[in-house]
């Protein structure tokens, strides 16, 4: 992906700074998920996650130049990006436009008419939850207000998810690939066992599987 933006600036997805920013959002997304929905991380877990995010990035074979060396360095980098670099673009708006949100793959039995009635409320809640995960500076950039009532709602949802997650058996909390990795490491599966693909429940609906927006094994 590359080109020239509306201000005449050239861009390319493989630019090291651009490529690392995408990776940084994966790291922060994992961090926010743990903090908001899983009761948080210990200091040791924070350090481990940061170190693993660097190790993961190194696997891409890209320059390590943009990668902060410490968590403190990363926080400064993140704050700078959110406050001074990010822009409100059509791509950002597309992510937040859930007006055509498809029926979840795990509810194939739900009639389309029923989903059409449920979709507006689901979309509003999903966007509200997403905005709650944003830094305040990003909310401001995109024009979202955030009241005490919004924060209270957000915290209640996070707490409900955290409590529900505790009821899920430990093995079922992991993605099938992560679970298989643990099983290979502990000897439950042979070290050369084939990697599992995305489970059927996670696949897009059949009429959307040819879209380049989705990864579908064997397509």
Each predicted region: which residue ranges?
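Mature, function-bearing regions of proteins
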Residues: 1-219
